[in-house]
Amino acid sequence: MHSNQPSLQRVLGPIMAIAMVVGTTIGSGVFKKAFALSQETPFFAIILMLWIGGGIFTFLGALTYAEVVSLFPKAGGNFTILKEAYGPMWGFLWGWVDFVMIRSASLAALASIFADSFFDIFRIGIPLWGKLAFTISVLVIMAYVNVRGTRLSASLQVFITSVKVASLLMIACIPLYFLVFPMEPNPVSKTNLTPVWPGEEGVTFSQLFSAFLAILWAYHGWGNIAPVSEEVRDPQRNIPLALLGGVGLVTLLYVSVNTAYHLVMPMDSIRNLPAGSTVATEALRISFGSAGALFASAAIMISVFGSLHGNLMAGPRLLYAMGQERMAPVALQNLHPVYNTPALAITVLAIWSSSLVVLGGLASSLGFGLSLFDLLTDFAMFGSVIFETMAILSIFVFRRIRADADRPYRCWGYPFTPILYAVIPACVLGNMFFASHMVNGQTVYTHHTELYAGLVFLSIGTLVYWLIIRPMSRKPVS
C-alpha cells in the first residue's frame, strides 16, 4: 500500500458499534428458524435451552474475540487475525471462504427473505424469476447506499437497529399484553407449551446438533464489528463494549420472542406451518388478525434489511484489506475519491451475491430438498464454523507470540472460555457429515448438499492460493 493511498476514517462511535453487532446479528433467524427447530426437537424446554445455549455459546465467543480483535483494530477482521496467527494461507482461505460462501450466501439469503416479506405484505403472486430479479435489485440498492459513505451507512444502521429492537420487544410483550387486557378466546395459554420435555422417544445428539446449526445462523453476525474495526473510534474500549453488550441484548430478545411464539402457538401448529409463512407471522395473525400478520411481515422486512445492510457494510472491508496485502486484486484497496469507501469491493461482493441468488434459486427449483433460504444459510454456516472457531482459538497463539502486547481487555475465564466455545462447533461440523433422515425407506443425509459444495469451494481456494496468490504476493512491488 502506498503512503499516499487514502485510508479509512474512524467515524464509528460506541452506539454505532453496538448497532453494528446487534443489527447484523438480528436478521431472519429469529423469525425463520423456529420452524426448523420444531422439526428437529419438538419440545419447548429443549428449544428454549437451545436458544439460551446459543446465547451462552456466543457470549463465550465474544469474551474471547474482544481480546483478539482489540489487538488488531484494522479492516479485514478475521483475515488479519488468521494471517497473523497461522500464516498467510489461512488468512487468504478465510477471505476466500467469506467472499465465496459465508458473506455472499448470507447476503443472498437475507435479500431472498426481504423479497418474500415484501410480496407477502402486498399479497403479490410472482414467478420464481420475478422474485430473483427483485432480490437482486435489493442487493444493488444496498450496495449503492454503502458506496455513498460510512457515516451515512452507520447512521442508517443505528436507525434500522432501533426499529427492529423495538419490533422484537413488541412481539416479546404479546403474553404480557393479553395478561393485562384479557380476552376470549385468549390466544396465550401455558398449554401451548406442551410437550415440554421428550417422552420415551427422546432426542438424539444428532437432532440436537442439527437444531443448533439453525441456532448458529440466528446468532451469526455478532463478529461483524471486526471487519470495520479500522473505522471504530477508541477501538480498544468500544469493540469489547459492542461485542459483550450487543450479544447480551440479542440473547435476551431471542429468548423472550421465542417464548412468546410458543405461548401463542401449539407445537403442532408450528411444525405444520404453511409453506412460505413464518412462526412470527402466524403468531401475530392468531393474536391480532390480519393487522398482526402485516406487522410481522413488516418487522421481518426491517430486521432483514438491517442485517443485509450491515453485512454489505462489513464484507467489502475484508476485500479491501486483502487488496492491500496483494491476496486479491490490488484494485480492491482503492477508495471512492468522493465518499472514501471501498466502492469496487462493495460492487464485487454485490455481484457475486447476486450470482448466488440465481444459483440458489436454480438449485431450489430443481428439488435439492431444501428451500432457497435453508440451502444458502447451511452453506454459509459450514465455512463459518471452521474459520470463526480458528479465529477464537488464535487467542492461545497471541498469548504466546504477543505476550507483551498492550491488552486493555483480557478474556475473562481464559483458557477455559475459548476451549468451551470450540467444543460446540466441532460437534456441529461433525454432525453435518452424519445427520440423516428416512425418506420412503431410504436414508437421506440432511446436510450433504451444502457440505460437499463447501468442501469443493474450500479445495478450490487452497489451489488458488498455492498456484496464483502465493507467487503473486512474493513478487516485488513495482
Q: What name fits each language-model region?
A:
Residues 1-46, 58-59, 63, 74-75, ...:
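Membrane-interface "cap" regions at the ends of multi-pass membrane proteins
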Residues 1, 79-83, 111-134, 167-170, ...:
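Helix-loop-helix connectors at the membrane interface of multi-pass transporters/channels
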Residues 38-46, 116-131, 151-160, 295, ...:
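Transmembrane helix-loop boundary segments of multi-pass membrane transporters
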Residues 130-188, 220, 243-247, 380-390, ...:
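Membrane-interface loop-to-helix entry segments
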Residues 332-340, 385-437, 445-450:
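C-terminal membrane-solvent junction of multi-pass transporters and transport-like membrane proteins
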Residues 3-8, 47-48, 125-130, 162-297:
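Helix-loop-helix junctions that connect adjacent transmembrane segments
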Residues 36-39, 58-139, 144-147, 152, ...:
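Hydrophobic transmembrane alpha-helices that form the core helical bundles
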Residues 80-81, 87, 120-124, 196-198, ...:
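TM-loop-TM module centered on a large, flexible mid-protein loop between adjacent transmembrane helices
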